[in-house]
Amino acid sequence: TSRLVGSEMCIRDRNMTAKTITLSNGLTILLDHFNSNTLSIGLWLNVGSVNENNKQLGIAHMLEHMAFKGTKNRNAFDISKEIEDVGGDINAYTSKENTAYYVKLLPSNHELGIEILSDIFLNSTFPKEEIERERGVIISEIGQSNDMPDDKVFDKFYSLAYQNQSIGKPILGTKVSVGGFNKDDLKEFCNQNYNPSNLIIGISGKSVSYTHLTLPTIDRV
């Protein structure tokens, strides 16, 4: 168990007090306390489609999907059920420059939220059958995106503005690239990019005293 210790910086205004803490392993923790009946906890990674090479188009997004599909401790059903059983919500998204995983729940359940986010970050197993299932889901998403004028304009703009650069490539990837990913590809991208120096843990809302907050799994990050 680790206490929240490290270099600190406080940001204050009339409505909230935010504190950032940087640990020795490079991980940053952002604590934003304000009067709310709920709590949001998130993992924000400085990793997105911009980190992909031409053979990896869409892998950051697929890795985000696969994070919810099983760990060493939970299967896909358990990950959702444990959060939903306490009235919470868990979700994620991938952008060109970031990937985020987050939960929203009651302050009294903050340890559960931290535990599950830590589990999917540290212990995802990428089951082969789930890879095939999510491959189909994402290829369907690509087809839907190709039928949406707004998405087509967005992708075209970026491809012209950032020619021959990864930021100009589509976040979802292509049917060909997504169709070729396997477990080793996902693990390699994860090992290269999912590390403490790329990670911000954000905790926002009404919570227990932040000076006494413990992160049970932070030593393993």
Model region roles, listed by residue range:
Residues T1, T20, T71, K175-V178:
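Short basic coil micro-motifs at the edges of alpha-helical modules that engage polyanionic partners
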Residues T1-D13, H212-V221:
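Single conserved hydrophobic/aromatic residue that forms the stacking wall/gate
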Residues S2, A60-E64, R133, I218-D219:
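Residue-level micro-sites within transmembrane alpha helices that shape
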Residues R12-D78, K187-L213:
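His/Glu-rich zincin catalytic helix
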Residues T22, A76-L213:
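Charge-rich, well-structured scaffold segments of protease-associated domains
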Residues K72, F126-P127, V221:
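Charged, solvent-exposed alpha-helical segments that act as regulatory interaction surfaces
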